[in-house]
Amino acid sequence: MRADAPATDGLDEAARARILAKAALFAPPSNELADGRRDLVGLSREELAAAMAEIGEQPFRAKQLWHWIYHQGVTDFAAMANIAKPLRAKLAERFAIGRPEVAADHLSADETRKMLFRFRDHEAVETVYIPDVTEDRGAVCLSSQVGCTLSCRFCHTGTQRLTRNLSAAEIVGQFMAMRDAYGEWPSPKGETPRLLSTIVLMGMGEPLYNYENVAKAMKIVMDGEGIGLSRRRITLSTSGVVPMMDRAGAELGVNLAVSLHAVTDDVRDVIVPLNRKYNIAELIAACRRYPGASNARRITFEYVMLKGINDSEADARRLVELIDGIPAKVNLIPFNPWPGSTYETSSGNAIRRFANIVMDAGYAAPVRTPRGQDILAACGQLKSKVAGAA
């Protein structure tokens, strides 16, 4: 694939088709419960209307249910006050409003909170809430897959083999369960402050390798009559699944974060093996094409600082050359160690020198403060299975 291949190139279309076909091999289980009821969480508006039609109800019932499920956050049909009791009973017989099970709940000394969510097939993922230390708001870091195929050398999740993709219900369910934990229902209106104010798709898995379910979940989250989180409050992070980046930009228009982490193919091939399929030139070209990128909506380049690997002044200068002309900022992430990791965090001096070179070129280069390290909730530390676990 050429570095300057246009988004409509037949090669990109073929690559997208292959990615979606592979995703189907790791499809999540159906939304049918063991007792035969269907989970309504994760259904689109159209699917919800179809479910109502199947039981002989009018389309407006779907609108009512949408409000109760995604705006009010109820999990019991009995709480739906504007629906007649006989219909509530009928709905309860046929359907459920699910949440993942909270299998573990850890609170860091810095108030970062990590939950292990277990699903009906007993698979599990970790989800993290990162509160803003200066304001009553914070980000929810969502997972998109159980495990990961990318095997990034510095990432704990990469040591957990991919089991399956998450469904739209399981992705949006993580956010809804976090809202349950913080009592943030009904959905705040307009500019009303939210504790859970942003979503970052930076948890376990590669979102663009589970694009259909991620996109469906984010469309539910962005619906103004439900959870109502605007697209500018959502950031999708990718390690560089180039063929899907154009589609995500066109269909979702959310903020883009790119896990770059190296400025030469020789280094990135080792620490981000996906680079062997989509190299740095192709990745940067896709960033230049990304719809809506502007000074107001900058692409974030994520760069984990690894001692002696990617943290030299020459690396910083090469980074500036690579992203020249792209509306961007660079998040510098001190490496967060995890059990069995072989890398070391760059020194404070090395990080400062690197940041200064990037900033002198006109790019913001904040150094991310590690959050939740004491509960293995920091960037690159998530993993839902431990060695020897069933």
Swiss-Prot record:
Keywords: 4Fe-4S, Cytoplasm, Disulfide bond, Iron, Iron-sulfur, Metal-binding, Methyltransferase, rRNA processing, S-adenosyl-L-methionine, Transferase, tRNA processing
Tree of life domain: Bacteria
Disulfide bonds: 141-379
Catalytic activity: adenosine(2503) in 23S rRNA + 2 reduced [2Fe-2S]-[ferredoxin] + 2 S-adenosyl-L-methionine = 2-methyladenosine(2503) in 23S rRNA + 5'-deoxyadenosine + L-methionine + 2 oxidized [2Fe-2S]-[ferredoxin] + S-adenosyl-L-homocysteine; adenosine(37) in tRNA + 2 reduced [2Fe-2S]-[ferredoxin] + 2 S-adenosyl-L-methionine = 2-methyladenosine(37) in tRNA + 5'-deoxyadenosine + L-methionine + 2 oxidized [2Fe-2S]-[ferredoxin] + S-adenosyl-L-homocysteine
GO biological process, one term: rRNA base methylation
Record domain Radical SAM core: where: 134-374
EC number: 2.1.1.192
Cofactor names: [4Fe-4S] cluster
List of residues binding [4Fe-4S] cluster: 148, 152, 155
GO cellular component terms listed in the entry, alphabetical order: cytoplasm
Cofactor stoichiometry and binding remark: Binds 1 [4Fe-4S] cluster. The cluster is coordinated with 3 cysteines and an exchangeable S-adenosyl-L-methionine.
Gene3D superfamilies tied to this protein: 1.10.150.530, Aldolase class I (3.20.20.70)
CDD domains (alphabetical): Radical_SAM
EC category: transferase
Binding residue positions for S-adenosyl-L-methionine: 205-206, 237, 259-261, 336
Record: active site: 126 (proton acceptor), 379 (s-methylcysteine intermediate)
Family: Belongs to the radical SAM superfamily. RlmN family.
Cited function: Specifically methylates position 2 of adenine 2503 in 23S rRNA and position 2 of adenine 37 in tRNAs. m2A2503 modification seems to play a crucial role in the proofreading step occurring at the peptidyl transferase center and thus would serve to optimize ribosomal fidelity.
Note: Reaction proceeds by a ping-pong mechanism involving intermediate methylation of a conserved cysteine residue.
Entry protein name: Dual-specificity RNA methyltransferase RlmN
Gene: rlmN
